[in-house]
């Protein structure tokens, strides 16, 4: 069996590569709220907003393109990804639906963020895409995704810390507060992996 020298980094986009507070100004304006990221203690935004799932998804359909076009990058992500792209494959696997592919790729280009492939799976379950792309390490903000990926593949999963994902995790889910911290952890992991 041939061992790949290059690692395949799998990355979620929303709340991981983008600032996790991206949606808040839009939600606060629409639903007359003053929520901060610290107020969002559940991934299901309907709980913080006090609205139904139907109301949320109707709003989302109307606003998602604008939000995704104007999303801010997570602090420090560009420098880290730029360095990693030199030696590793950057494969983004997102729950975004396929009709958002052009907007998503345009955003990456406008933000000067490197990518080798972007896969829009249209659902939160990313297991098959991770299997297909033979991902070596994954970056995520959604707690149950991080746990499922870690348990299914026994790979490290970097969980970008937010108030909505602070539940217990298995040992191979590593909670990180900032992209520079993620880089330091990954550098050590690469050394231990003999890279």
From Swiss-Prot:
Enzyme class: hydrolase
Keywords: Hydrolase
One family name in Pfam for this protein: NT5C
EC numbers on record: 3.1.3.-
SUPFAM superfamilies documented for this protein: HAD-like (SSF56784)
GO terms of molecular function: 5'-nucleotidase activity
Domain of life: Bacteria
GO BP, one annotated term: deoxyribonucleotide catabolic process
Record Gene3D superfamilies: HAD superfamily/HAD-like
Lyase among keywords: no
Family: Belongs to the 5'(3')-deoxyribonucleotidase family.
Descriptive protein name: Putative nucleotidase BH1399
Annotated organism of origin: Halalkalibacterium halodurans (strain ATCC BAA-125 / DSM 18197 / FERM 7344 / JCM 9153 / C-125) (Bacillus halodurans)
